[in-house]
Regions:
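Conserved residues in the N-terminal Rossmann fold of short-chain dehydrogenase/reductase
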Residues: 31, 237, 264
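Flexible "cap/lid" subdomain of the alpha/beta-hydrolase fold that forms the substrate-access gate
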Residues: 37-73, 77-260
């Protein structure tokens, strides 16, 4: 059993390439729209989106299909959930993989305080997302523009773009991302239109509420049932992913203390499942079919 957790602003649809490949390789695959997204519930209360609730959703899925354990794979914010769920429910996840975001230790201060210490007076999108209202309205005004700009987020080596994203000022988030003038080569119009239709229907508040739980998550994970992840763990990243610039990847083994591995895809950006689906699928299958990992997964399903 493999459970796939999408990120922001994504959907279960974002895993469409991997679902087929994993199923053809013999795995049972669950790829839900997570709470706040797509066809799943969108509770109004911000506290409904804590990492404990999101992790409990995954356990509930396993219970629903009668599976005691699963390998857990997450991308972007889905990787945050994937790295946290084995700490909260260590008996339910036999292996874990995170895409674009590696496992990082819990900061010494609440997460938004840690971000403010790093970014100071500069603009940082996660801090902008904290206040209900402004970001919700900005992203929902024109979902096609929102998604087109987010999917075209520049790579880490685009210094001018990085400066635009950080410069203090009254403008919101999207104005800092240049209009790309078209779709990136990794997504066609039909697939893009599906995203637009879904986010036009649901808007972005449920998705943004995940970000508004950062500090509450910090409180809730102070003393999890497991202090570290001892299950086999894999991080898959893109060498051109701008988000890695502010992620302490060098501390990953403080969290994943068992069999931890990394695969960096040369030239890849942030949207790995769609930008380089074959590379991602190959890395996942090499991990899942490794004799050590495979034995653990198979023994957990008996």
């Amino acid at each position: 059993m493999v459970v796939l957790c999408h990120g922001f602003p994504e959907l279960a649809f974002s895993w469409r390439h991997q679902v087929l490949a994993l199923a053809e390789a013999g795995y049972h695959v669950l790829a839900p729209d997570q709470r706040g997204y797509g066809g799943s519930d969108r509770p109004a209360a911000v506290d409904a989106y804590t990492v404990t609730e999101l992790s409990a959703d995954l356990v509930g899925l396993l219970d629903d299909v009668g599976s005691q354990q699963a390998a857990l794979v997450g991308h972007d914010f889905g990787a945050v959930v994937a790295w946290t769920a084995p700490l909260l429910h260590p008996d339910r996840f036999s292996a874990v993989a995170g895409l674009s975001l590696p496992p990082v230790p819990r900061p010494k201060v609440p997460t938004t305080q840690a971000f403010r210490k790093v970014f100071g007076d500069n603009f940082f999108y996660i801090l902008y997302f904290q206040e209900p209202g402004p970001a919700d309205a900005e992203l929902a005004e024109d979902p096609a523009t929102t998604l087109r700009r987010l999917f075209a987020t520049p790579s880490a080596d685009d210094v001018a773009a990085a400066l635009r994203m950080l410069t203090p000022g009254p403008e919101g988030f999207l104005a800092r991302i240049p209009e790309p003038g078209g779709l990136p080569g990794w997504i066609n119009q039909q697939d893009f239109d599906f995203y637009v239709e879904e986010f036009t229907r649901t808007e972005f508040t449920g998705a943004l509420n995940w970000y508004r739980c950062f500090d509450r998550n910090w409180e809730l994970t102070a003393a999890p049932p497991a202090a570290t992840i001892d299950a086999p763990a894999l991080f898959i990243g893109g060498t051109d992913d701008a988000t890695l610039a502010y992620t302490p990847r060098h501390r990953a083994r403080e969290v994943a203390t068992g069999d931890y591995r990394e695969v960096m895809i040369k030239g890849a950006g942030h949207w790995l499942t769609e930008e380089c689906p074959h590379d991602v699928t190959r890395a996942l299958l090499e991990f899942l079919t490794d004799p050590i990992v495979d034995q653990r997964i198979r023994s957990s399903t008996r």
